[in-house]
Amino acid sequence: MSGIKRQKITDLTELVRGGKRLPAWLVLWAEKKLGLHALNVAHDKIEDDWDAGSQDNFFKLACKHLNLNYELEGLENIPKEGPCVIVSNHPHGMSDGLMFGDIAMKVRSDVRIVVNEFLHHVRGMRPYQITVDVYGGEAAKRANMQGMREMLRWLKDGHCLLVFPSGSAATWSWQDKRVIDDPWQQNISAIIRKTGAAVVPMHFSGHNGLFFQTLSVIAKGVRSNFLAREILRDGKTLHKVRIGKPINPSTLAITETDEELSDFLRLNSMMLRYPRTAHSAAVATSEREPIAESIPSEQLEAEINALPADCLCAHNESAHLNVYAAKASQIPLMMREIGIQREITFRAVGEGTGKSIDLDEYDPHYEHLIMWNTQDRKLVGAYRIGRTDVIMDGPKGFKGIYNSAFFNFSQKLQKILRRGIEMGRAFITPDYQRHPASLDTLWMGIGKYLCKHPEYHYLYGTVSISSEYEPSTRSLILSYLQHHCMNEELAKEVKAYFPPKSLKLNSEDERLIPKGLKDVRLLGHMVSDLEKDGKHIPVLLKQYMRLGGRMLSFGIDEDFGGTLDGLVLVDMCKAPSRILKRFCGKDYVPIPDEASPTDS
C-alpha cells in the first residue's frame, strides 16, 4: 500500500501564500530543509499501518516512525478517570507534543491536547487537539476565546487536557545563560480554578538546537517554521520524561491568584528535571561501630524515680508518657541510654556519628528533657536544652554553646540570646515516631519548662534536613526558607562557618519561589512528590514554623552526614496564642525585652 499517493501530514503549499504555483522540485527541496518531508514520510507509514489493521493511535505511531524514544517515570501518577490537566514544560515545540499524547493515551483515551496554530497543520493530531494562537496579537486573543470555551467544556465533562502553558518552544535566556520556557500563560490557571480539575506536572528533558535558538534571538517570529526540522535531531536522542504526583484542587486553592498558581505549577514541572540520587549513608556501614548495649529498664526506671518531684514537666496519662527535665549529673545511666538511642535514631535517617554511642562534650553542662514511657519502661525521646546566660557565665563562655562551633555569632546577637534557651539533639525513637502523642507530649514538656523559667522567651537551635532528602528537595526547602522565613535583621549578625554553597536551584526556578511557593503546605506537597519514598518536611521544622520561628542562617554539618542545618529563632512573645495555650497552658506569660529585636 505504500505506493498509494496520500495527503501530506503538513503541506508546504498550504502554509505559504501562492504555494500552489511553486514548482514541485522547489517544494520538495524546501520541505526537506524544513523537516516537513520527514513528517510526510512518517505520515504515509502511519496510514500504511492503519490500512494494515493497526489499532494504535496517531501519537504512538508518530513516535514509532519518527524514532522518538523516551525513558518514562511516573506513568502511574496520571489519573485513570475524572477531570485532569497535565501541564508540562515545552522544550521542543513539536516532538514533545507527539510524545505527550503518546504518554497520556497509555492511561486514558479521552485526551485533548492544546496546540498552537503551527501544530494545527499536523492533520493526524486534529481529532485530539484544541487550537490556540500564541503569536497573533489582539485578534488572536479574541479567536482564542473559542479554544478556552472548548477547554472548559472538556474538563467539566470529566476528561483529560494536555497543556504546554508556555505556548511555544523554550528559548535561550541571556539572563539565565540557558534555554528556558517562555512565561507560562495564566489563563490556564483560571481554567483549572473554574473546573476543579486535578493537575499533574510533567517534565521533558532537552531543548532545540543552536540554529533554532539563534533564530529565537534574531527572528523569533519565524522560528516556528523550523520546528519540524528539530524532529530530526530529536529522533537521535533518548528523552527523559518524568511525571509528578497529582495535585488535588484543595491544594491548588491555597494559591490566591492565577499568577501564584501559574508559578506553582511551573515550579512543580521544573523541579522534576533534577535527577534523583542514590543515597549513601553518612558513615559507611563497614566503618560504623556496633551500637552499645542498652541499659536495663529497671536501672533507668530507678534513676527516673529518684529525681526530685519538680523535675516532672509533663504527664500524658493516656499515652503513658512522662517528660522530665534533669541535669546530666543527675542521670548518668539515662545519659548513656540517650547517647545510644540518639545514634540508633539518627542512623536510621542517614545521619549519626558512626560511633557506638552519641554523646559529646556539651552534654555534661546542658540540661536534658527526657520522655519516658511508664508502661513500656522505655526511653521514648529527648531534647538537649541549655540556658544561654548560665552557660555563657560558666568557664567556657559562649564557646560552651553547641552552635558556636558551626556559626559565628556577633556580640549583639550573643547579648540577645542570653534571654534564650538553646535546643538541640532532639529525637523520638523509631518505634514511637508514628505515635502523634509523642511529639506533642515532648513539646508540652518544653512548654512547662518555659513556665518555670518565663524570663527566657527565646528558643533557638538548628533544625536538620538530612542527606536522606534529595539534593533538589533540600535546595527547594532552603530556598523557601530564605525567601519566606528569614529574620533579615538578625541574619546579619550570624554567619555559618560552612554555608551550603552547592544547594542551589536554577535561577529561573528560584524566581518562582516568591509567588509560587508562599505557603508551607504547598512546600509540603512538593517535598512529598520529589522524594521517592514520599516523606514530608521534617517534623521539627514544621513545629518551629507553627511557633512563628524565623531563620537566621544555614550551614552544612559534614561530621553528621552532610546534614543541612537551619539556625532558627522563636520569640515566644510573638508565638500564636493558641499554640502557647496548648503547650504552655493559659497562664504562661513570657517576660519580653524592653524592645524586641526580633521584629522582621
Residue ranges and their predicted role:
Residues 361-370, 535-536, 561-566, 578:
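A short helix-loop-beta-strand connector motif used in the catalytic cores of GNAT acetyltransferases and
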Residues 286-329:
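Conserved N-terminal entry element of GNAT/NAT acetyltransferase domains
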Residues 343, 353-356, 390-550, 555-565, ...:
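Acyl-donor binding region in acyl/amide transferases
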Residues 124, 131-152, 156-162, 166-195, ...:
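Glycine- and acidic-residue-rich phosphate-binding/metal-coordinating active-site segment common to enzymes
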Residues 1-87, 97-99, 106-108, 126-127:
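Membrane-anchoring hydrophobic helices of lipid-metabolizing enzymes
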Residues 311-368, 372-375, 380-384:
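Short amphipathic alpha-helix that is part of the acyltransferase structural core
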Residues 108-115, 366, 372-400:
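Carboxylate/His-rich catalytic cores and anion/metal-binding grooves
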Residues 10-12, 141-293, 511:
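Non-catalytic C-terminal accessory region of glycerolipid acyltransferases
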